[in-house]
Amino acid sequence: MSIRTRWAAIVAAAAVTACPAVYAAGASATLHHITGEGEAESVGTIRFADSEHGLIVTPALHDLQSRGLHGTHIHANADCGATRMGDHKMPGGAAGGHYDPEQTERHAGPYGDGHLGDLPNLTVEADGSATTPVLAPRLTVSDLAGRAVMVHAEADRYDDHGDHHHGKGGVRMYCGVIE
């Protein structure tokens, strides 16, 4: 974990601890495992709250299949359904691409000048849980209306020159519509 990622987690955790009522005006999403057939079992929630430093993203997830870092993004559409791509179905394809209202078409990470939907990587512990808050400094709760949050199978490298077309975080594994 980079020093920047650790610092963001520390700031987010401090803000959440100091202001537990901050979620009164926030948003949340219940995440489900997604397949080519649609949504399956729930794996918990992610809460979103504004702070003076940006958007605090607080996961309360369990029973995740893969440990380590996972790319996490805000996607353009409030739909986690599968879509057909050629001869197969893409889990979560209806969520569209990363939220990119300025149409930068750049995958520069949460601190760069690309997609606004790029969030810091989610940390999944050995027991399959993810509870470490992160900070998305360029987003606010008001940006989240009509969107979905997606957790991918692999860590995001925030690189437009990778060899994977699913946002550099691997296949889509978990999705939730933000409310």
Task: Annotate each language-model stretch with its function.
Residues 2, 18-179:
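N-terminal leader/targeting pre-sequences
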Residues 10-12, 17-19:
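Sec-dependent N-terminal signal peptides
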